[in-house]
């Protein structure tokens, strides 16, 4: 996001109030677990609700008042998400994007099959009626639902326990700001943002006092809702990226 907006470290420090040395260490990856108040200051600085709204499609005259009934009447080939009554266009995922989501889902599914339990993994495209209302229907890249009553014929009714978004240039602002806010408000327990371009994973475990925790692809990333018994290995993903996968 720093690169995308064209800010220097000095500008970020001056405008956010975070010391220059701290800013440099966070964005270089030297500091893996920044203090919570530091993260809040940086998140506030980068928060762009108006720019996020620019990704709302202008094709829909009633944006802001659409419902899941309107969503259900759209053609299958028209990929959108409905968030608070607004339609957000979704580009078709790349081969790399789907490979990453598929690898994360595979490891989760294998763990659940081997260890049992009531939780069910899913992978996009699955509709999630996040707020149990008529104004929001999203399609997270990967998720886990542990309350079987939330699993419906159409998809998931209510907040999943665990969600992953693999970001792309077209979804970056939405995943970092709008969806983060929606997921925490809806009661999602854990949310991962996988930035494969930077080879980073931001882990938001909302039951913890400190988040996000930032991981690289060089070591397994623990899934907190499983008390760290499940860890996602990014070795294959890192290799694919090295081989030129996009």
What are these regions (language model features)?
Residues 17-34:
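Recognition helix of helix-turn-helix/homeodomain-like DNA-binding domains
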Residues 1-15:
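Short basic helix-loop element that most often maps to the first helix and adjoining turn
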Residues 36-52:
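DNA major-groove recognition helix of helix-turn-helix/homeodomain DNA-binding modules
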Residues 54-62, 106, 110-111, 119-120, ...:
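C-terminal interaction segment
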Residues 61, 84-87, 92-105:
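Nuclease catalytic cores
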Residues 79, 191-193:
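Short, surface-exposed charged micro-motifs
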Residues 29, 49-84:
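Polyampholytic, low-complexity intrinsically disordered segments
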